[in-house]
Amino acid sequence: MADNMTTTQIEVGPGATNATINFEAGILECYERFSWQRALDYPGQDRLHRLKRKLESRIKTHNKSEPENKRMSLEERKAIGVKMMKVLLFMDPSAGIEGFEPYCVKNPSTSKCPNYDWTDYPPTPGKYLDDIEEEPENVDHPIEVVLRDMNNKDARQKIKDEVNTQKEGKFRLTIKRDIRNVLSLRVLVNGTFLKHPNGDKSLSTLHRLNAYDQNGGLVAKLVATDDRTVEDEKDGHRILNSLFERFDEGHSKPIRAAETAVGVLSQFGQEHRLSPEEGDN
């Protein structure tokens, strides 16, 4: 299975979440206009309603992390999203949005290129994704948890017990899922813990998340460059969905991979990075 498997990589840069939300709001506006023409079939109407619900939820969460003067409503984002489409479809810089100038990527000499950081976000100098080492950085006294053939409730409790020994600061955690001596899941996490006055701990920064298949091949790598926090509200859920699908293809009890990952992420307060379907498992 590992021979034909490619590694999926994501690099998180500033502004990408905002731009994506605005773009999807523009798509929603197009869906709604199409619906007003009575040209949208029933599956299309269903997609329209689901997209609207997801966007409203995502905007609400994202706005909490934004300064008050940068918070925008769905309607405001729709207007920006439609302009973004004009830029993309017609390569028209006159319709340009601040921070969104794909025309400038091809024509950097043009005078209408004030800023296009998010479209061409530079990685850490000398640290392009393909150059970043596969293993997260080493830290003192890394935690390794091997979950042998046990039920998922016991597995989650063992993870919780091990994680609770972690002190404040950077950490590295390896989770292995061993069922009948078959290594079905391995997740390697690098991040930073904060310890609160009441004794609770939270994951303040997720620097890396590597996941491996049964044969030890790297399946997915989630990277936050320059120690930036992986942006809020489900930026990683698609990569995790893809990861679980690949595990599912090669294991007799695929749900264990998803359930174990739910348990791992829940210990760090990161359940929102899972899709609703995964969270229900």
Curated annotation (Swiss-Prot):
Binds and inhibits the conjugation of the ubiquitin-like G1P2/ISG15 protein to its target proteins. Since G1P2/ISG15 is an early antiviral protein, NS1 may inhibit the host antiviral response. Prevents EIF2AK2/PKR activation, either by binding double strand RNA or by interacting directly with EIF2AK2/PKR. Also binds poly(A) and U6 snRNA. The gene is NS. Residues 1-93 are annotated as: RNA-binding and homodimerization. Residues 1-103 are annotated as: G1P2-binding. Changing R71A: No effect on dsRNA-binding and inhibition of IFN-beta promoter. Both N-terminus and C-terminus can inhibit IFN-beta promoter activation and IRF-3 nuclear translocation. Homodimer. Interacts with and inhibits human G1P2 conjugation by UBE1L. SUPFAM superfamilies: S15/NS1 RNA-binding domain. It comes from Influenza B virus (strain B/Lee/1940). This is Non-structural protein 1. Belongs to the influenza B viruses NS1 family. Changing R38A: Partial loss of dsRNA-binding and no effect on inhibition of IFN-beta promoter. One of its GO terms (cellular component) is host cell cytoplasm. It is found in: Host cytoplasm; Host nucleus. HAMAP family: INFV_NS1.
